Amino acid sequence: MAENTMWHETLHDQFGQYFAVDNVLYHEKTDHQDLIIFENAAFGRVMALDGVVQTTERDEFIYHEMMTHVPLLAHGHAKHVLIIGGGDGAMLREVTRHKNVETITMVEIDAGVVSFCRQYLPNHNAGSYDDPRFTLVIDDGVNFVNQTHQTFDVIISDCTDPIGPGESLFTSAFYEGCKRCLNPGGIFVAQNGVCFLQQDEAIDSHRKLSHYFSDVGFYQAAIPTYYGGIMTFAWATDNDALRHLSSEIIQARFHAAGLKCRYYNPAIHAAAFALPQYLHDALSAQ
């Protein structure tokens, strides 16, 4: 792709978004997908896979803080964390901020994503790949969760949309495998698209996850890069109390962890589980 052109996202047929390409840093096909990293004056460095924006330097902190701190602080004493996907390293960066976590395993199907993001998105990983608690596994996420002998307290599915390599991370086989290697009282979370435009994804995930977990729901965050409204995150656990912890408990855990965030705070944590009525109605109609 030439510089000083417009890059158009291809996720939706009838509408979408575009970014001015000021400088192409990398554009190649990896073993699994088309990967481009370019610079944009408004959003900094932008990474897209197969024509869909995955992350930008300007607003990635919202996504990664919410995917990480909500489940980890709700759990309260997570020692072992599994990240599925997350090759840009930002999810890992946020998990490493929790000093009580003892092991962090990241399973990424595409070694190319990890390699090129380390080089071209250094602010995302911020050196977290060198954390001694971290182990990288290059494997398919479904295969890993169904074969591993490890167990985890929190599983974060930092998946792409349910197309291409990411499609398998929205299947019953994946959810069943996650339940299999999740410790009692553990929490599973996953990105679940922009529910106003991708409502069927949320409905499908809710239906499938409900076969394996007693408490299934969603929480949300407004992330400008993800076109169409508020990003939805799936939540699943067998500890029904964790989604309804008091603000005092979350506040105490937040301060004990010593976190300083740019988006997440205990009030946001509680508010994130308030869902729009159209999503309640859609889930009730299943």
Swiss-Prot record:
Protein's UniProt keywords contain Cytoplasm: yes
Binding site for S-methyl-5'-thioadenosine: 33, 108, 140-141, 165
GO molecular function: spermidine synthase activity
Keywords, ordered alphabetically: Cytoplasm, Polyamine biosynthesis, Spermidine biosynthesis, Transferase
EC number annotated for this UniProt entry: 2.5.1.16
Any one cellular-component term (Gene Ontology): cytosol
Enzymatic reactions: S-adenosyl 3-(methylsulfanyl)propylamine + putrescine = S-methyl-5'-thioadenosine + spermidine + H(+)
Pathway note: Amine and polyamine biosynthesis; spermidine biosynthesis; spermidine from putrescine: step 1/1
GO terms classed as biological process: spermidine biosynthetic process
Localization terms from the record: Cytoplasm
Pfam families reported for this sequence: Spermine_synt_N, Spermine_synth
Active site positions: 158 (proton acceptor)
Top-rank EC class of the record's enzyme: transferase
Chain ranges of the PABS domain: 5-238
InterPro entries reported for this sequence: PABS (IPR030374), PABS_CS (IPR030373), SAM-dependent_MTases_sf (IPR029063), Spermi_synthase (IPR001045), Spermidine_synt_N (IPR035246), Spermidine_synt_N_sf (IPR037163)
Keyword presence, Cytoplasm: yes
Residues reported to bind spermidine: 64, 88, 158-161
HAMAP family: Spermidine_synth
Subunit structure: Homodimer or homotetramer.
Function: Catalyzes the irreversible transfer of a propylamine group from the amino donor S-adenosylmethioninamine (decarboxy-AdoMet) to putrescine (1,4-diaminobutane) to yield spermidine.
Similarity section: Belongs to the spermidine/spermine synthase family.
NCBIfam families per record: MFS_SpdSyn (NF037959), PRK00811.1 (NF002010), speE (TIGR00417)
Protein name, UniProt field: Polyamine aminopropyltransferase
Organism: Salmonella paratyphi A (strain AKU_12601)
